[in-house]
């Protein structure tokens, strides 16, 4: 299987909306190459600085690189994406450039790794690629060694970062956790590092379960986390203190009642993957079911909600 790399050079004002369009149409990640970074060589909010190569960046504006499965990226999808981008009010249509290239499966396996380096995803958690060596900068730093494979995110998406921040705030060692749609297993590993002893990781995709198990092994918790195939919480009979779901909004909407029923009294539903246009509907549904919304995070057009199961 090959991959299509769609490369778009646009103005800064259109980056956020353009990125959302690409992700909503199924891009397996979006790389952002900002020409301003060459000038500023900025350090991130946790103090890390990376050496940047001029040849990797456009002369001006921002280059977005989106990756699509060649089997599903057809003329119809190509035109739909282009039409939506060109309809953005924020887009400078005089300076937009589109290009494509095919990346063979064997090249793709290594191409995405060029953009994945250790980074601090939240106050406590640092994500470390399995092929890199990293030394902790502080005693309280918790490192998650990750090899997401080609089909799963690297942990740098805003929804993952917000979930990690919520885990830092609400998950305690004495809690039990169920991670719905575990993907790479990153949120289960984070819960383990907090000290949680009972963790169950579910995913409907057996490949995800396999990838998660391998990442659990890398983080020395493969015997401590139960990783199993599962269709949301439809067949779940156990009770947990924490339900975590970083998945798409319409799927979250389907599982809100099941999440409430799965939680012990006083438990927390940590959920993200919600675009800002849909979060009010998700929040209202959670409140109707009985959740008290105790936290709301926004980051780059995405929202993370934390609801607590409380008695009337």
UniProtKB/Swiss-Prot annotation:
It is found in: Cytoplasm. It catalyses: L-lysyl-[protein] + 3 S-adenosyl-L-methionine = N(6),N(6),N(6)-trimethyl-L-lysyl-[protein] + 3 S-adenosyl-L-homocysteine + 3 H(+). Its main location: cytoplasm. InterPro entries: Ribosomal_L11_MeTrfase_PrmA, Ribosomal_PrmA_MeTrfase, SAM-dependent_MTases_sf. It comes from the Bacteria. Pfam families: PrmA (PF06325). GO terms for cellular component: cytoplasm. CDD domains: AdoMet_MTases (cd02440). It is an enzyme of class 2 (transferase). Keywords: Cytoplasm, Methyltransferase, S-adenosyl-L-methionine, Transferase. The keyword S-adenosyl-L-methionine applies. HAMAP family: Methyltr_PrmA. Methylates ribosomal protein L11. Belongs to the methyltransferase superfamily. PrmA family. This is Ribosomal protein L11 methyltransferase.
